[in-house]
């Protein structure tokens, strides 16, 4: 080998000896165990006891004990309801048919000589029955079937619902509508009764009973039908009401509630518009604490100042409270004792409110505009800032208010746009409304004018053969056009979900500057606290909502202070408007319930609802709807989103009918479980049930993402490359959206390589060859928030009539 030559390195061949690696054995080493334990120390004492296997006889004995305990609990509940230790058994009679309304319904309930009837002079239709012989008492109320709100309020506090059926049809369309609302709210124990069977020939009674059984078995499985025509049949019905098992409603079992049987208003100011309202009734549910807030259904939250204990108006011992006649015998019919000086002498004050222990009525956080502001800089800092500004040129970009720093860095500069940065600030209040409207309006502007579409839709919906002068007088043409437009938008959203046409008269990067692209909707991160709206400074948020809920429920079970269940009390409610008393004077029921801690505060509530099958009108997001959530009623403009287990949830433009949807609104906190009913008010004042469900949670951090889809058409197709047009209309927009991933309807994925020309054509690369009939899509996302339109005032609905002018959405043609 020459001296200057370099020696080649040895390379091992294929037959090099391979030694076996070291094996640590079947067991892990101590270091591996320490790494897996991560500092955890083994328990020195066994925490869980070994399960002891019981013998067959012991297992049988244990099962018998559990069965006996459950039976005793049910019997104790039955015996406490309607006795001296509990409130009277509250029975609400509801007529499910117009012909089933009877004014003398409760004239049959008194069938024994010793029974006592009390007539309430303040609540229309309330009748109390006291039976000293069996030591039971009942309160019967005939509900007004034409007032849906009153009917639902009475059902919230009722122990038993007495449904009255028509012997011919069972229930009518309005009765079926009331049943849908009652089932969605939560149905307590119920009894079905029919009146008027005596007027039917004997030969036809068996057939009519079979027909009624077929009608009721769809709604009430294994329900027994009772007749209510004689006193003997009424006695059998009352026995069934007293002995049947009580059904519990979750939203009221953890709260104290009461139906006001007497009311008195004492003004506290010179105008007489605000004062102290005294409501008397029986405490139900849980103990009533005077330091808690109380909610009067339909009127708001208030403070209690005092709780009194007046004499029981329906005592089981008639010798104490019942007046005597001249002959010395008991009166069978009596009125409730009036509130006067004699009663006031017997009133005992149970408890008075402690101002230091009372809950606050504050429902919103008052944001501090100076919060987060820095202190005023020193002179040295000001000089340093001036020197820094002299050396650098100020870059001004046209961005919307609330855009984050890294989003603003992506926005390209436009010539002459630097001095117009405040143009978008003037339209800040209309951003959300205009943005949603423009998404749907761009596709309609290119097809033709709105007047031509309206004329064509009129010709389709009202043919010449069916026109009639009297019929046309009852048709609102403007309402018909608006409803048809909603049907078209909903149909378009189902066929082309989230697709939006790129505007030609506006720059796309300005039009969609609040949107962003995501690599993956499921896995890409999204900051929960980024660019929150100002309304989020007004709400309350829990660190752990379900942990707080568990703690509040546990405290409610352990507390033992307050008016006990079954006591007849008078509650003094402070700062109540006189309209509440006027409401009671008109014969409308007043229902009050105590609020749990934090339930007066505003937050973001999420409710899981499903579309009611009896309504198919299009319900667009952010439309004003009426909500019945537990004991509360309010109006709000909700967001609709998909129900999933991911951290981001896609918003829905319309209330879907084929799946469950999560509704998000600003509303006072309510701890679940609670039933939810969603109504939409018509132009004539009627309220239609559009969705039912339950309260999901209270979580302002739930991310609702709105998606828009920009579409383009492949112009020239190579192997894996294609020229796409009609997605953008200028070169700058193509460069701006270049980082966003593309997809096609046939499953291809790709990205933008470069723009071609100045008319928005772009060269794109895909993972496979495109088909000529395929469509190129681009997904853009932004987070959306509900509108703060919460209104606790809900107008009372007009008597409901079924809407026959419904349209099948699949038959609506899109222009």
Curated annotation (Swiss-Prot):
Q: Tell me the InterPro entries matching this sequence.
A: AARP2CN, Bms1/Tsr1, BMS1_TSR1_C, G_Bms1/Tsr1_dom
Bias (Basic residues) ranges = 19-30
| Region of interest (Disordered), residue spans | 1-51, 320-342, 408-482
Comp. bias (Acidic residues): 412-458
Keyword list, A-Z: Nucleus, Ribosome biogenesis
Q: What GO terms are given for molecular function?
A: GTP binding; GTPase activity; U3 snoRNA binding
Q: What does this protein do?
A: Required during maturation of the 40S ribosomal subunit in the nucleolus.
Q: What is this protein called?
A: Pre-rRNA-processing protein TSR1 homolog
Biological classification of the source: Eukaryota, Metazoa, Chordata, Craniata, Vertebrata
**What's the gene?**
tsr1
